[in-house]
Each structure stands twice: as structure tokens, then as C-alpha cells.
């Protein structure tokens, strides 16, 4: 059978929260089969399982909330776990926010690969899309469609000089594209004016040119420029992959986003789960039964 995965060993890192600016200790630990991804607040001795229903705030990031306990900015770490096929993991945090690291999923990919990956004696579960599902909010929309693989496309639309030279749309079919090489390094981005307003409201206190692409009225301020020509839209794809992993399983289907964000992504997940005829949970006995997007080596 195609088995679930967890980490071989625990691994620790230190960073700062993007919005709080607080120092955060992060430890990724192996978890038993069928546990899922569980965030544990070591400062409060409380835990929250990563599920679509646990999302309680999506204004600036994806935030899990349960009985007043919060864990925010989970999407980059979840994207890395999804990209590496990790089904079960304890995420221990000393504060309320996952550290922003360099603003991408790449540091989390490095941590997981350094800890090692092991298979477990339980079948890996997939969610297969059977019927189209869509959520529309004005000129923004998100949709799932049936697809025998995993494909994510996204369109952004910003009225700003920097984006005139940018690819506004990207599509990633993971049967032929490496998450690690082509998506994981895309950093979060923000506009200087918005960052100044956020800081005035005591938010984005940990943000800097070391962990985000910052854009002023005319240009990218980071001296090293962009990691990909289409890094802005690639980061939206990275975010979406993390948000979609709140299904608790790898997805067999395609996702399309147009000018959407964390809120619409979560609304789409909830709508999908409400429509039981639109999806099914599946497992696979043999590797050659898997959609090609999932039979690639982890190190690709």
C-alpha cells in the first residue's frame, strides 16, 4: 500500500513572528499514523489540529483558533509539509505565531529533509475531487475541478508598475514540476505603504527585507531582486497549497484562484466538505495506481 509519512527525527529552529515580532522556538516532531498535523502551544500546554474548521481568522494570514488559543501564519509550513507529503507531524511552538523565516516555505523544506522522512504502517489518504466546486466574491473567485493529478493555477491583478513586468498568471502541474525547485522559494510580499500602516497598528512588527519582498511606489526594494520571474504569483500558489492542506489529506484535483486569498481558500474548503457528493477519500495499494503528481521522489 501507499503509506503515510512522518519525520524520522525531531528538529528545532528559531525565528520571529511576522506580525508579533516575537522570538519563536519551533520544533517539528514525528507523530503517529492518522494523527494529522497538530500545532502545540508549549507556552500554554494546548494544541490545535490543522483542519479547515479550525480556521478562525484570515485577515493577514491563516490563523487556527480553538477556545481562545491561536496559532497564526501556518500556511508556509503547511505548504512545505504538503509538498513533501508529510501526513503526520507535531509542530511545537513557544508563541502564537509560526516563525516567518525567510518568507517562503524553503526553510521548512530544509528542516523536514534534515530531520528525514519515514513511512508508516497506515494507508495514505487522498481527497479526490469528483465535481466542480466554486466560491465567488465580487471579482475574486476560487474553484476546484476534477483532475487526475494535482494542479494549481493562480491569477493576480495589481495596479502597480512592478506588476506590469510580472507574469500575472501561473499554473503548476506537479506531474511535471518540482514543488521544491519551482514553488517553495517564493516569498511573501507587501507594499511599503501598507506595511507602514500595519506597523502603526502594531502588526507586521517582524517584517523586513530579510523575510519578504517589499515594493515601494515604483520598484522592488530587495537588493537581490526576485528569486523567480513570477515570484509574486508563485507565492500565492505556495499559500494556496498550504491552505488546501487543511483538508488533512493530499488533493487529487485542480485548484484555480483569481485574486483570492486565505479567506476565499478556506470558504472553498468548507463548501467542498459540505458537498459530500463532490469528493471522495481514496487510498492506493500500488505505486502505479497513483496519479503521477504523487509518485515523484521526495528529493525532486
Curated annotation (Swiss-Prot):
Pfam families, per the entry: LpxC
SUPFAM superfamilies reported for this sequence: Ribosomal protein S5 domain 2-like
Residues bound to Zn(2+): 76, 235, 239
Cofactor(s) of this protein: Zn(2+)
Enzyme class: hydrolase
A GO BP annotation: lipid A biosynthetic process
Active site: 262 (proton donor)
Associated pathway: Glycolipid biosynthesis; lipid IV(A) biosynthesis; lipid IV(A) from (3R)-3-hydroxytetradecanoyl-[acyl-carrier-protein] and UDP-N-acetyl-alpha-D-glucosamine: step 2/6
GO cellular component annotations of the record: membrane
Gene Ontology molecular function: metal ion binding; UDP-3-O-acyl-N-acetylglucosamine deacetylase activity
Catalytic activity: a UDP-3-O-[(3R)-3-hydroxyacyl]-N-acetyl-alpha-D-glucosamine + H2O = a UDP-3-O-[(3R)-3-hydroxyacyl]-alpha-D-glucosamine + acetate
Keyword annotations from UniProtKB, A to Z: Hydrolase, Lipid A biosynthesis, Lipid biosynthesis, Lipid metabolism, Metal-binding, Zinc
Family: Belongs to the LpxC family.
Record function comment: Catalyzes the hydrolysis of UDP-3-O-myristoyl-N-acetylglucosamine to form UDP-3-O-myristoylglucosamine and acetate, the committed step in lipid A biosynthesis.
Protein's recorded name: UDP-3-O-acyl-N-acetylglucosamine deacetylase
Gene that specifies this protein: lpxC
Amino acid at each position: 500500500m501507499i503509506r503515510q509519512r512522518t519525520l524520522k527525527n525531531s528538529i528545532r529552529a528559531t525565528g520571529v513572528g511576522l506580525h508579533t515580532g516575537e522570538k519563536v522556538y519551533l520544533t517539528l516532531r514525528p507523530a503517529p499514523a492518522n494523527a494529522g498535523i497538530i500545532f502545540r502551544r508549549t507556552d500554554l500546554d494546548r494544541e490545535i489540529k490543522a483542519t479547515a474548521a479550525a480556521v478562525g481568522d484570515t485577515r493577514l494570514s491563516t490563523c487556527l483558533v480553538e477556545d481562545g488559543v491561536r496559532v497564526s501564519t501556518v500556511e508556509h509550513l503547511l505548504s512545505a509539509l504538503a509538498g513533501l507529503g508529510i501526513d503526520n507531524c507535531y509542530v511545537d511552538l513557544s508563541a502564537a505565531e509560526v516563525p516567518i523565516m525567510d518568507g517562503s516555505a524553503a526553510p521548512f523544506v530544509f528542516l523536514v529533509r534534515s530531520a528525514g522522512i519515514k513511512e508508516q504502517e497506515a494507508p495514505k489518504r487522498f481527497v479526490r475531487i469528483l465535481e466542480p466546486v466554486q466560491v465567488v466574491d465580487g471579482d475574486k473567485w476560487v474553484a476546484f475541478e476534477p483532475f487526475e493529478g494535482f494542479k494549481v493555477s493562480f491569477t493576480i491583478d495589481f495596479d502597480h508598475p512592478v506588476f506590469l513586468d510580472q507574469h500575472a498568471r501561473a499554473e503548476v502541474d506537479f506531474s511535471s514540476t518540482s514543488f521544491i525547485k519551482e514553488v517553495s522559494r517564493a516569498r511573501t510580499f507587501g507594499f511599503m505603504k501598507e506595511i507602514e500602516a500595519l506597523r502603526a497598528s502594531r502588526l507586521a512588527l517582524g517584517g523586513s527585507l530579510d523575510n519578504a519582498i517589499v515594493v515601494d511606489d515604483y520598484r522592488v526594494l530587495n537588493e537581490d531582486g526576485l528569486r523567480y520571474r513570477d515570484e509574486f504569483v508563485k507565492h500565492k500558489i505556495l499559500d494556496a497549497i498550504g491552505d488546501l492542506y487543511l483538508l488533512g489529506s493530499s488533493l487529487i484535483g485542480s485548484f484555480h484562484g483569481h485574486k483570492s486569498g486565505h479567506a476565499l481558500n478556506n470558504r472553498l474548503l468548507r463548501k467542498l466538505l459540505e458537498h459530500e457528493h463532490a469528493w471522495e477519500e481514496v487510498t492506493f495499494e500500488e505505486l502505479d495506481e497513483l496519479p503521477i503528481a504523487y509518485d515523484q521522489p521526495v528529493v525532486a
